[in-house]
Amino acid sequence: MFDIKLINTEFDDVIQQKIDTKTKPLGALGDLETLALQIARVLGKDKPQIRNPKMMVFAADHGIADSGVSIAPSEVTTQMVVNFINGGAAINVFTRQVGFDLEVIDCGILKPIENLEGVIDQRLGAGTGPIHKRAAMTLGAVKQGFKMATDRVELHHQNGCNLIALGEMGIGNTSSAAAIMAALTGMKAEDCVGRGTGIDATTFKRKKMLVEQALLMHHCELDDPMQVLACLGGFEIVQMTGAMLAAAERNMLVIVDGFIATAAALAAIKINPNVREYMIFAHQSDEKGHVMMLEFLQAKPLLKLGMKLGEGTGAALALPLIQAAVNFYNEMASFADAGIEI
């Protein structure tokens, strides 16, 4: 479905030698050195550059939200999309600060927003089905979502972008992400479900019960990651998954945000494992399950700030660190350049 090249490690020794001979002790820049190696593998060993980075925020509603798994009603998804367009959300503040170009994509909120310019229409429906009662969507909708996401990534690629970051908005989407995590890792639902928007104990118990119910209902169809997305996914999660795969196919880097985005990343890796090396995991969120999912993927996030907002906020904050890794690799003098003998 996606022709993703296995990362070329042929020049790892050359890249590592360039890193090791900078004017610093070996390993002194820690995880930035590992990051620089990854970036040079993808974007080129000589002088990699981050070009036209794009923050893509995908929004959609979830049928399970009507069963009381969140403190917020589904209408908040639409209200937050309006907030994004008006520039008033955390993701707007952070993307302005770090120089990310932001776009907002309606993948399937309850109702289209009329008379609001700036929202990109990639609707797959008016919210998903309640996953504890029936499939979230058809397999055809998953494939359509992949096509939409691919077309959008291709547009950015044609405009010179070589790095995308993915954020989301969707009341109820932590339930969907937890179900995807459980299905694709084999972990227990109770270990994957967290408190999301800050729900109380009663709501938390209900949320775990409904996710377990969803996993039992769709059990016979959960061997295939595409079917997992159809049964348990969200329209925004599907399109994030497709965008990750499409970006890797085009030799672009992908910044993965928090819990929801990591569930999409997990699905993408199950579909095509080669996508993994194109992913940079931005942060460890405070949502229960994220640590275990990161460990399952053997992913070491750049930041740990106790955040659990979503929207792509962690991914936005990671961009300066990614740029710092590129800059030290390209611009820092070697011992020979500096005339330092050791």
UniProtKB/Swiss-Prot annotation:
Tell me, which GO biological process terms does this entry list? cobalamin biosynthetic process
Task: Give the matching NCBIfam families.
Answer: cobT_DBIPRT, PRK00105.1
User: Which pathway does it serve?
Assistant: Nucleoside biosynthesis; alpha-ribazole biosynthesis; alpha-ribazole from 5,6-dimethylbenzimidazole: step 1/2
Query: Which keywords does the record carry?
Result: Cobalamin biosynthesis, Glycosyltransferase, Transferase
Gene Ontology terms for molecular function: nicotinate-nucleotide-dimethylbenzimidazole phosphoribosyltransferase activity
Function as written in the Swiss-Prot or TrEMBL entry: Catalyzes the synthesis of alpha-ribazole-5'-phosphate from nicotinate mononucleotide (NAMN) and 5,6-dimethylbenzimidazole (DMB).
Official protein name in the record:
Nicotinate-nucleotide--dimethylbenzimidazole phosphoribosyltransferase
Record organism: Shewanella halifaxensis (strain HAW-EB4)
Which residues participate directly in catalysis?
Answer: 311
Q: Which family does it belong to?
A: Belongs to the CobT family.
InterPro entries assigned to the protein according to its UniProt record, in alphabetical order? Nict_dMeBzImd_PRibTrfase (IPR003200), Nict_dMeBzImd_PRibTrfase_bact (IPR017846), Nict_dMeBzImd_PRibTrfase_N (IPR023195), Nict_dMeBzImd_PRibTrfase_sf (IPR036087)
Q: What Enzyme Commission number(s) does the record list for this chain?
A: 2.4.2.21
Transferase as a keyword? yes
Report any Pfam family annotated for this entry. DBI_PRT
Q: Which gene encodes it?
A: cobT
Task: Name the chemical reaction catalysed here.
Answer: 5,6-dimethylbenzimidazole + nicotinate beta-D-ribonucleotide = alpha-ribazole 5'-phosphate + nicotinate + H(+)
Q: Does the keyword Glycosyltransferase apply?
A: yes
